[in-house]
Amino acid sequence: MTLRRSFGFAVAGIAAAGATAAICFGDALGLVRSPAKADDSIVSARFDAPAHPIEVLQGARPWLTPVPDGPKALRGKVVVVNFWTYSCINSLRALPYLRAWSERYGSKGLDVIGVHAPEFGFEKNPANVRLATSQLRVAYPNLQDNDYTVWRAFANQGWPGIYFIDAKGKVRGYRLGEGRYDEGERLIRTLLAEAGHDVSGVPLAPIEGTGVEAQADWADLGSPEAYIGYDKAAGFASPGGFRSDAANNYAPAARLSLNQWDLAGSWKVGGEYALLDSGPGTIRFRFHARDVHLVLGGAADGKPVRFRVTIDGSAPGAGHGVDVDAAGWGEVREDRLYQLVRQSGAIADRTVAVEFSRPGVRAYVFTFG
């Protein structure tokens, strides 16, 4: 799940410090102590880098977007490896920086490599990942890591997990979670200079994400990630609780407290998602955030599923997200993250409701920003 935790930008031989990060945590763990100097202090980090990371990448399969001249061409290059998954909001908000680094330094000896390690079942489908990389303008090479082979080799722990490898093939720094991108870019420049590349003519210009990729409003973010499937669900408030793996007619709660949610209509709640089983249905969440996202899967018949978003019972108007209009209408066409709400002005506790017009839609997780 997404948490705000203090994880440093750990760097071998280069200054590092602790920072607040937003992370989608995974299950694979590796733990050693990796000292890094920061103002004459030692920063310890949960990290176990592979001794030969380039060899790990060279042996990985399949490449959805191949490395020009093949994986062997990575040897002798400065490489940034990004573990991501395309429905994770934390991964999406990191993309503007990775794109910019690839564009700025690709001709100076840098290769950015994406390692797509799926969280949900639909993210294992190569066609879905290819569509997502096209829609998200991820032009740098990407490999698909459905069985987490590369993830485990790097002892990665969450999305995004960003690793900085020097031209000699050594992991020199890593970042678990969002943030500290300025330090990441400075490290890239240092590693390129060490390898004999002149980056003095490349300006350190600001990088700004837009739309769903815009940085979160951390100061007013009071809602955590909330899974809908019973494996990780918390805050479910419909009377009677879940009826697991069976269709059930759910009723809305009389009142939702902050960070509670409910269902209305006939839903089948599984471990990973809730499936609208018949008729129209609604899901609600009481939130405190600027942005509201919901990861949704389309109907099995491939036809779009229309939905309508309301905030405290009214159309979102100017507070609509990129995937709905001012009246609140949107369509589920692909399995992905949908931005429902982007507010401006004062942020307060509010209730978002999403009503789906017909069955077949799958709801996975609410995320916020």
Task: Please annotate each region the language model reported.
Residues 4-62, 182-369:
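Non-globular targeting/processing and membrane-anchoring segments
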Residues 68-92, 98, 112:
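Short active-site neighborhood of thiol/selenol oxidoreductases, capturing the structured segment around
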Residues 92-136, 144-150, 305-307:
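Structural microenvironment flanking redox-active thiols in thiol-disulfide oxidoreductases
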Residues 134-138, 144-187, 341-345:
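Thiol/disulfide oxidoreductase modules built on the thioredoxin-like
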Residues 79-82, 111-115, 141-144, 164:
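Structural recognition of the beta-strand scaffold that forms the well-ordered cores
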Residues 56-79, 102-105:
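A short beta-strand-turn-helix
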